[in-house]
C-alpha cells in the first residue's frame, strides 16, 4: 500500500517509483486547465478527466444536480490610525447577527441603504473567526473532491491581502493570530489529512496576473539575467475546444508539509509587484492565484484504488483605486488603469450572470477567463468583499457592496471531480519518467542542442502547431483523393445504369404494344365465358341458399350448446361458491367457537385465580381476627386480674386504715374528749371523702369492665359480620359460576344445533357425533363442578355457622360477665351506702351520747374490726371467684379457637385442592376441544379441495366434449360466380399470355442490340429523340 508522503516516513519508500513517494520536491511544467477543473496532461490519461462533467470514467463521478449560490462574505476593516487622528467619520455600520451592512446616507440627508450578505464581519472581527465561519467549510469540500475558489474583492487599502495572507511566519508550532486565510487553510488541510491517516499527495502553483500578463511566481530565476528582466517571463493562456482556459508552462511543486507551503508563499509573495500609494503603503499592483491540488487515495469495495482529486484556488485580487486620490502618475497610472479594467470586466461578468444574459464577457479579460469556473461554473466559490468604513471612500464602498450583493445571485453547479484510477496515473507517470530519463541521459552524454528555455518552449509550440496543421492538411488531401475515386466509380456505375434503363424502356414499349393485342382477344373470350356463367348462376344460387340454411341451423345448434355450457359453468360456479361459503362459514364457526372456548377457559382460570385469592384473603382475615380476639381476651383477663388485685389491696388498705384509726381513737379518746364535736365533724368529712373515693374507684372498675365487655362484643360482632359477608360472597360467586356455566351450556347447545343444521350430510354426521360427545363432556364437567361447589358451599356454611355460634356464645358470656360485674358493683355500692348511713347514725349517736362514748369505744372497735374482716373476706372471695371464671372462659375460648383454626385450614386446603383439580380438568378439556377443532378444520379443507377438483374435472370434460369432440359441417365458401360450366383448358388459357422473353429476343434481333455492350449506341440514339419513349403508348391508351 502506498504511504502518505511524510518526511518522517521516507525510510519506508520502496524501490519501484510511485506517485505518492517522490524522494524530493519536484518541479515540473504542466499545462494547467482552469475552466473544467483539471490539467491538460491529466485529461490525456486514457480519456479519464479530473472533473465530473465528461461522462463516465473509471471511477465514476459524484454529481450534485442542485444549484448553489455563490457565498458572499463582507468584511469591514477598522479605521486606520491616520483616519482616527483626523476624526474621519464612519459611513457604514455592520450587524454581525442580522448579517446586514447599512450605508449611512443620513450624513448627506439621504435615506440609508441596507445590504444583506451570507456573513458579515465588523471591524473587530478576528482572522480566526473569519476563517472558521466562512472558509473552513470550503476547505472540507475540497477534501471531498470539489474544486473551490476563495477570492478577496474590494477597493485598494481595505485589507484584501491581509485577509488572504496575513502574517505567514509561525511562532513555534502555532500560527500567528494575524495569519490569514491561506496559511490557516494549509494548516487545516494537513491536520485533517493526518487525522484521517489518509494516503495523499499535494502540489501547489502560484501565478501573478500583471497588466494582462501571467507570471509564474514559483519558477526558478535565471541568475544570468538582470533583475528587471527576471520579472518579465510571461506564460501563455489559451483555450481548449470546450472554452476552458489552459495555462501552459506553469510549474507545480510537490509539497509534504505546511512549512514548505509557507516558504513557497513567502518566496512568491516577495516577487509580487507592490507599490506605495497615497491610499496604501504596500499596495498590490497585480492579481495573484495560489492553487493547491490534493489527490487522496480511496479503496473501493473491489479493492480497486481510486484517487479523489480536489483543488483550492486562493485568489488575492488587486484593489480598484481612484487615480486622482491615489496619486498615481505615468507608469503607476497605467497599472491602475489595467487593474481597474480587469476589475470592471469582472463586474460586467457578475452583472451578466445575475441578469442571465445570453453572452457573458469572460474573454474580455484574462482574470475573468481564469475565474470562469468559479463564476457560474462547476466550482464552489466564496467571495470575501472588503470595504473601508471611511466616509471619504463612500462611493467606492457602495460600488463594492452593490457588486457583492449582485454576486450573491450567481448560481454555480458544483460537481465532484471524477475519481481517477490509480493504474492510469501510474502508467502516465511511468511514461513521463521514461521521457525524463532519456532527457537526463542526453544531457549527460551531451548529445543534443541546448537553447534557452523560453525559446525552446516557443519553438516547440510552433513545431507542434505546424505538425498539427500538416497532419490536418494531409488528412484533408487523403479525403479529397478518396472522394475523387469514389466519384469516378459512381459516374461509371451511373452511366452503365443509364444504358440499361434505356434498353429496359424500349423492351417495355414493345411488350406493351403486344399486350394490347392480347388483351383484345382475352376480352372476347371473357364475354363468351360470362354468358355461360350467367346460365349457371341460377342453379348455383339455389344450392348456396340451401347450404346457407343448413349453416344457420348448425350455428343455432352450436349456440344452444354454448349456452348450455355457460349455464353449466354458471351452475358449477354457484355450487362451488355455495360449498366454499359453507366451508368458510363452518371454519368461521369453528374459529368463533374456539375463541369462545378460549374466552370461557380464560375467564374460568381468572375466576379460579380470584377464588384462590379470596380464599387466601379470607384465611388471612380469619387468622388475623382470631389473633386479635386472643389478644383482646388475654388483655381482658390481665386487666380483670389487675383490677381484682387492686380492689383487694384497696379494701385491705381501707380496713387497715380503719383499724388504725380506731386504735388511735381509743388511745386518744381521753385526750379529745374536750374536742369531741370538732373530732366528730372532722370524722364526718373524712367519712364522706372516703365514701366518695371508694365510689370513684368502684365506678372506674365498672367502666373498665364495661369497656372490656363492649370490646369483646364488638369483636364477636365483627367476626359475625365477616362470616356473613363471606357467606354472601360465596353465594354470589356460586351464583355467578352457575350462571356462567348455564350460559355456556345454553350457548354451546345453540351453536351445536346451528352447526348440525348448517353442515352438509357427511360433515353433519361427523359434527353430530362431535357435538354429542362435547355436550356430554361439558354437561358432566358442569354437573361435577356444580356438585363440588355445592358441597364446598355447604361445608363452608357449616364452618361459618359454627364460627358464628362460637362468637355468639363468646358475646353472651362477655355480656353476662359485664352484667355480673355491674350487679356486683351495685351491691358494693348499696353496702357502702349502708355502711355510710350506719356510720352517720353512729356519729349522730356519738354526738348525742358524747358523755357515754368512752364506755362504748371498745364495743365500737370490735364491731368495726369484725365488719372489716367480713368485708375483706367477702371481697377476696368475690375476686377469686371472678378470676377463676375468667380463666375458665379464656381456656374455653382458646380451645374453641384452636379447633376452629384447624377446621378452617382443612376447609381452605380442600377448597384450594378442588379449585386446582377443576383448573386441571379445564386444561385437559381445552386441549381435547382444540384437537377436535383442528381435525374439523382439516376435514373442511379436504372437502373444499375435493369439491374444487370435481368442479374442474366437470368443466374440463364439458370443454372437451363441446370444443374438441363436437363435429360440425364446414360452411361453403364458394360463391356462384366462381363456378364455370363451360371452362377452358389450362393450355388454351396459357396461350392467351404474351410471350415476353420471345418478344425481347425478337426486338433485340430486329434492332441489332447485343445486351449491355451496345448500350452506348442505343443511348446515343435514344438521346437524339426529343420525345419520351412511352408517349406513343400513352397516346394510344388515351
UniProtKB/Swiss-Prot annotation:
Encoding gene per record: KIN5B
Cellular component GO terms held in the UniProt record: cytoplasm; mitotic spindle; spindle microtubule
Keywords: ATP-binding, Coiled coil, Cytoplasm, Cytoskeleton, Microtubule, Motor protein, Nucleotide-binding
Pfam families in the cross-refs: Kinesin
Family named by the database record: Belongs to the TRAFAC class myosin-kinesin ATPase superfamily. Kinesin family. KIN-5/BimC subfamily.
Protein name per the record: Kinesin-like protein KIN-5B
Coiled coil segments of this chain: 453-502
Biased composition, class Gly residues, residue ranges: 49-61
Keyword Coiled coil recorded: yes
Species of the source: Oryza sativa subsp. japonica (Rice)
GO term, biological process aspect, one: spindle elongation
Domain Kinesin motor, chain residue ranges per copy: 69-410
